[in-house]
Amino acid sequence: MVAAPAQPGSGGLSLCLASVGVVKALSVVAFKLVWTHSIEKTEWQEDWRITPGGLELMQARVKGFGAGMEPAPDARLVDGWFQWQPKRAAMPEVVLANSGAAGEWRLCSDGHCETLSGIFGHPIGINVTTMRACDP
């Protein structure tokens, strides 16, 4: 598991993931979301923080560019990755779709990554997963 299950009454916020009628709460305050673009086969990474206002995107990185993967105009090239800090408000929820064409979303925390199917304990296939900040 990418993080320990959230403990009710432990205070603070957790990351809640919902897919196919199952909800998982993870005790993390920040995480990295990683996926491979279905057409370009290029890796994309995003660093997220859980806040009382929702999920806040702190930094995005893409290894290259192509169809629908253009780095932001203020991106810098660092060690082969285009990196930038998106300027957007925290979001109450983030919906992750999966075409099934390029592998799964991976969630990373404390140097360990796991697929969403691994976190849920069963294949999620092309089903949508919703992420949101939640109280454990």
Please annotate each region the language model reported:
Residues 3-8:
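Boundary at the C-terminal end of the N-terminal hydrophobic targeting segment
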Residues 9-66, 71:
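N-terminal secretory signal peptides
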